[in-house]
Amino acid sequence: MGSCSIIMTAITEYKEIIGNGTTRKPHYLATREAFSIQDPPANSSEQTKAELLYLLQLQSTRSAEDVRSSMYFATVYYRVNTKPGDKDYTQMQRNLFHIGRSIAPWFCADSLPMTAALVANVWKDAAYLIWKYKNYFVRIRPYKLDTNLKNQEETNWAAYPSGHATNSYANAYLFSELLPEFATYFIKDAYDMAHSREIIGVHYPSDSESGRQLAKELINRLKLNSNFLSDLSKAKTEIHALKVKHGYP
């Protein structure tokens, strides 16, 4: 099968399953808000060729532990319509704090319910944007362009921007507003999440970078939203009280 046929087959498969993505609604954002996400590199571009070579290099050097941890990261997501009583509700709440999980035992949904609600609402906005632009760009997965890539996960939707990268960086930038002294840790966790998708061959580096940029623009945009700022203030108060309780400066 030629490369054009492979691309069209993959796009057809993808379009058959995106219906639920197109029905997502944001929480804080207005649906008509535009973001400055750039077009992905063309499939035949020199950048895409270079990124495919990079992914092949990652494939040749990745260890079993790299794959194991990356496949674990693949399970870290938030189902935006989750609710108390759902069998995965506890896990979804835990996933909200995957970024920054190492900074303190109290940095979790159980200890910070208002912060957890804020993060969940931001994930709704991020999910809306992710699917909006995945549906718009319909970028082919790297392993569909180069069959020498042995992807460790099968994904039947578009690559650009990376959902894991967008969500993780959105968390990182949001948490940096709440706990700026830990910003380096948050950004490192988000980078590791984004890079894990490259390690297992399902995302180009430009997918990760577009997700980072989209997340940064999202948080900056939300800082102009009065409802978000009100919820952010409540989360800051909640976190400050817990820091005082645990003897943090």
Please place each PLM-identified region on the residue numbering.
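Hydrophobic alpha-helical bundle signature of multipass membrane enzymes
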Residues: I6-I200, R221-N227, D231, Y248
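Short acidic/histidine-rich active-site segments
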Residues: H203-S206
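Catalytic phosphate/nucleotide-handling subdomain of diverse soluble enzymes
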Residues: K216-L218
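Primarily interfacial, aromatic-capped hydrophobic alpha-helices that serve as membrane anchors
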Residues: K234-P249
